[in-house]
Amino acid sequence: MPADIMEKNSSSPVAATPASVNTTPDKPKTASEHRKSSKPIMEKRRRARINESLSQLKTLILDALKKDSSRHSKLEKADILEMTVKHLRNLQRAQMTAALSTDPSVLGKYRAGFSECMNEVTRFLSTCEGVNTEVRTRLLGHLANCMTQINAMTYPGQAHPALQAPPPPPPSGPAGPQHAPFAPPPPPLVPIPGGAAPPPGSAPCKLGSQAGEAAKVFGGFQVVPAPDGQFAFLIPNGAFAHSGPVIPVYTSNSGTSVGPNAVSPSSGSSLTSDSMWRPWRN
């Protein structure tokens, strides 16, 4: 009897049907589900990349700083990053110093570039609506502080920008068709006869209308061209108040001096009563 029951159970079509026939197939995964399922794998790969980069960075920074790697075998990630930042800042300062020593205009270019970037950031923050007000204020304040520090920078051998004297203005030469501004080689020294210092504001001499119009002021002295092509220097009284260096007087395009001797402005006791020194007189 038990054998007959076993035969009936084995011959039943329901028992012979596999269980997988009654189950429904799996639905395809959506993009979000796929991201969720692959997120642990991506996180593991990201951590592995970070650790590998930090390991290489640790080796490089210890070699650059010439430190024994055996004594720094257990450095934290934050320590490695801080050492790298300090090393890069030192390299940047060294490169800036070397560049300034070879070309002083580098600092001006750097200031101009930083100022342009700061203006662009300010322009963007003033038009962008999604930036927090506190963040905007802090960022602009930080850029302003950096700009102040950059303006205070000087290259080796240069004084502070606020202490530098402005360059002297280029002198204006006397009027003439073929005369360039006074910049010849060391000029001959010419004696300054007496009486060459009229009081300020007084008319120096009676020249023609064209000669009077051509009179120019050069370096504190009034230059009066003579009809024969030479020039006369009118020296104010203040030039003889204190002793000073010898005053060079330039002559016409012939390049010759009127006299072989030279006197100092302090020799005011030998002045004569002439109102003006005329080099064309012998």
From Swiss-Prot:
Gene Ontology MF terms: chromatin binding; DNA binding; DNA-binding transcription factor activity, RNA polymerase II-specific; DNA-binding transcription repressor activity; DNA-binding transcription repressor activity, RNA polymerase II-specific; E-box binding; histone deacetylase binding; HLH domain binding
Residue ranges annotated for the Orange domain, each copy included: 110-143
PROSITE patterns, alphabetized: BHLH (PS50888), ORANGE (PS51054)
Broad class of the protein's primary localization: nucleus
Pfam families per record: Hairy_orange, HLH
Record's keyword terms, sorted: DNA-binding, Nucleus, Repressor, Transcription, Transcription regulation
Low complexity bias spans: 10-21, 264-275
GO CC, alphabetical: chromatin; cytoplasm; nuclear matrix; nucleoplasm; nucleus; protein-containing complex
Record-level GO BP terms: adenohypophysis development; amacrine cell differentiation; aorta morphogenesis; artery morphogenesis; ascending aorta morphogenesis; BMP signaling pathway; Cajal-Retzius cell differentiation; cardiac neural crest cell development involved in outflow tract morphogenesis
Motif mapping: WRPW motif: 277-280
Ranges annotated as biased composition (Basic and acidic residues): 26-35
Entry-linked InterPro entries: bHLH_dom, HES_HEY, HLH_DNA-bd_sf, Orange_dom
Expressed in which tissues: Expressed at high levels in undifferentiated neural precursor cells, but the level of expression decreases as neural differentiation proceeds.
Region (Disordered): 1-44, 158-204, 256-282
Bias (Pro residues): 164-174, 182-202
Protein purpose: Transcriptional repressor of genes that require a bHLH protein for their transcription. May act as a negative regulator of myogenesis by inhibiting the functions of MYOD1 and ASH1. Binds DNA on N-box motifs: 5'-CACNAG-3' with high affinity and on E-box motifs: 5'-CANNTG-3' with low affinity. May play a role in a functional FA core complex response to DNA cross-link damage, being required for the stability and nuclear localization of FA core complex proteins, as well as for FANCD2 monoubiquitination in response to DNA damage.
Domain notes from UniProt: Has a particular type of basic domain (presence of a helix-interrupting proline) that binds to the N-box (CACNAG), rather than the canonical E-box (CANNTG). The C-terminal WRPW motif is a transcriptional repression domain necessary for the interaction with Groucho/TLE family members, transcriptional corepressors recruited to specific target DNA by Hairy-related proteins.
UniProt subunit comment: Interacts with SIRT1. Transcription repression requires formation of a complex with a corepressor protein of the Groucho/TLE family. Interacts (via WPRW motif) with TLE1, and more weakly with TLE2. Interacts with HES6. Interacts with an FA complex, composed of FANCA, FANCF, FANCG and FANCL, but not of FANCC, nor FANCE.
PANTHER family: BASIC HELIX-LOOP-HELIX TRANSCRIPTION FACTOR, HES-RELATED (PTHR10985)
Protein name: Transcription factor HES-1
